[in-house]
């Protein structure tokens, strides 16, 4: 075993069915007196139901969270925080709401508690993202990490199947790309494998029965593992492409990850043999990109970037943006090969495994 150093970063985690009821105790443990509750417009009523036990301790609600964390939304949320004299944040929802909470925690230096309702995994990472002027900026800062995360699988039972599947594939992407990170060590490798295995197993069960509480529990556990791995590992081509597609074209986050992942792995895995072997073991297939493609197809997830709003003329722009900055990746970034990847993903073709 090689030598390694692990600076382990993690929120306090409360996991299991019904754990949303622990919110009053967990908020008290944080010493929070007046939390501002964040949600998307669609989840405002769910958020109100969850925080009802803490009553008038809630300073107020901000239900404007939206994907890719636009600067104007951040500004509105900061005004809401200051206008309500809040001292902390409760974020309830998916990656968009968590992403907004992370920026507020960083900008205002306040603690947050997150209750995820999807499998995005953002709540476990120090990664933040902001979109301004059609460009998405990302970075890392320990300040954005929530103090506490409550994982209650019962809150995901009503998550629509299409969102469940793409969100789960998004989580798989975090760990799959982590397996060829230069920062990988045996601890994080185990987390990646556990997370991917749990999600690979859960997705077909969710398709068969979306209300399967055990499958929901396994998927949420997998998302936790994959998100934690991402926190400690570098990102490569897949995440760069998805951030570019999302921030520049405003494509939906989870769907973009689900579509791009098989193609990004087809590009990289021939240059990352150890990661390829691990993924072959988990997927039960020598052709991992096709196994992921089939998993998405059989679950009814979108397969092409055209389906979610990309236009043919966007391909050269995205290619050039992805090539603009250097970042670690197993395979050198080549303009023609990258364009082929994007064309295949745009058209929804089976990934090229050559």
Swiss-Prot record:
Assigned keywords, A-Z: Aromatic hydrocarbons catabolism, NAD, Oxidoreductase, Plasmid
One Gene Ontology term of the molecular function aspect: alcohol dehydrogenase (NAD+) activity
Domain of life the protein comes from: Bacteria
Coiled coil: none
Pathway of action: Aromatic compound metabolism; 3-chlorocatechol degradation
InterPro entries documented for this protein: ADH_Fe/GldA, ADH_Fe_C, Alcohol_dehydrogenase_Fe, MAR
Catalytic activity: 3-oxoadipate + NAD(+) = maleylacetate + NADH + H(+); 3-oxoadipate + NADP(+) = maleylacetate + NADPH + H(+)
Tagged with keyword Ion transport: no
Keyword Oxidoreductase: yes
EC number of this enzyme: 1.3.1.32
GO biological process terms, semicolon-separated: 3-chlorocatechol catabolic process
SUPFAM superfamilies cross-referenced by the UniProt entry: Dehydroquinate synthase-like
Binding partners and assembly: Homodimer.
Protein family per UniProt: Belongs to the iron-containing alcohol dehydrogenase family.
Name of protein: Maleylacetate reductase 1
Organism: Cupriavidus pinatubonensis (strain JMP 134 / LMG 1197)
């Amino acid at each position: 075993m090689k030598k390694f150093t692990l600076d382990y970063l993690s929120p306090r985690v409360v996991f299991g069915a019904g754990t949303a009821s622990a919110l009053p105790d967990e908020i008290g443990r944080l010493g929070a007196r007046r939390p501002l509750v964040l949600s998307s417009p669609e989840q405002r009523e769910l958020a109100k139901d969850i925080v009802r036990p803490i009553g008038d301790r809630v300073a107020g609600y901000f239900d404007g969270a939206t994907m890719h964390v636009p600067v104007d939304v951040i500004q509105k949320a900061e005004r809401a925080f200051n206008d309500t004299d809040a001292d902390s944040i409760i974020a309830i929802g998916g990656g968009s709401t968590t992403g907004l909470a992370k920026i507020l925690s960083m900008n205002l230096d306040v603690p947050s508690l997150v209750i995820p309702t999807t499998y995005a995994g953002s709540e476990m990472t120090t990664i933040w993202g902001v979109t301004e002027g059609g460009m998405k900026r990302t970075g890392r800062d320990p300040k954005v990490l929530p103090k506490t995360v409550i994982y209650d699988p019962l809150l995901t039972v009503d998550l629509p199947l299409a969102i469940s599947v793409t969100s789960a594939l998004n989580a798989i992407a975090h760990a799959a790309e982590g397996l060829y990170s230069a920062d990988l060590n045996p601890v994080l490798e185990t987390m990646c494998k556990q997370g991917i295995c749990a999600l690979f197993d859960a997705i077909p069960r969710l398709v068969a029965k979306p209300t399967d509480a055990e499958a929901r529990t396994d998927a949420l556990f997998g998302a936790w593992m994959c998100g934690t791995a991402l926190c400690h590992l570098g990102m490569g081509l897949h995440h760069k492409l998805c951030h570019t597609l999302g921030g520049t074209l405003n494509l939906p986050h989870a769907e973009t990850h689900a579509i791009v992942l098989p193609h990004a792995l087809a590009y990289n895995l021939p240059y990352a043999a150890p990661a390829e072997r691990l993924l072959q073991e988990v997927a039960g297939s020598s052709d991992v990109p096709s196994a992921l493609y089939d998993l998405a197809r059989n679950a009814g997830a979108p397969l092409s970037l055209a389906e979610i709003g990309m236009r043919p003329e966007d391909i050269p722009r995205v290619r050039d943006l992805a090539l603009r900055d250097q970042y670690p990746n197993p395979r050198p970034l080549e303009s023609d090969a990258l364009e082929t990847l994007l064309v295949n993903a745009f058209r929804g073709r089976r990934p090229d495994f050559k």
